[in-house]
Amino acid sequence: MPAPFDYIDIGQVVGLGMARIETAVLETFIAAFTPGWTADRGAPDAMVYAIWARLDAVASTDWPQTKRLGVDALRWVRNPPVGETLRGRMTVMAKDPVGEGKGIVIAQHDLLDEEGRLVFSCLTRSLFSR
């Protein structure tokens, strides 16, 4: 789990948890948010993003992260099928102090499938307290 800004190391890798693609959840998501998509194509991109966002939100609840400044460089590599378990991880790429009480942490976030293949990736910029 990340620490205050000054104790976060570049290259540090943090697990964000796991989530399984469940049939009922996939069907409900498709009906609500991606009309025209079919479940046989796997989880739609929007659902993959939502899974990452949930894993990130739960994992970072107790972090000294005070604000998410941006999410960019989003990449979807594949649409995981029903039954697939995805694993989230965050890798600290860079950090920059901005004043006495805070600093910006730039991190790459990945969702990997059960075989360790990349499913989704993005970069984040977050403010952490020092």
Residue ranges and their predicted role:
Residues M1-D9, P80-R130:
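HotDog/MaoC-like acyl-thioester-processing domains
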Residues A32-W37, A73, L111, R130:
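Short, surface-exposed, charged/polar-biased interaction segments
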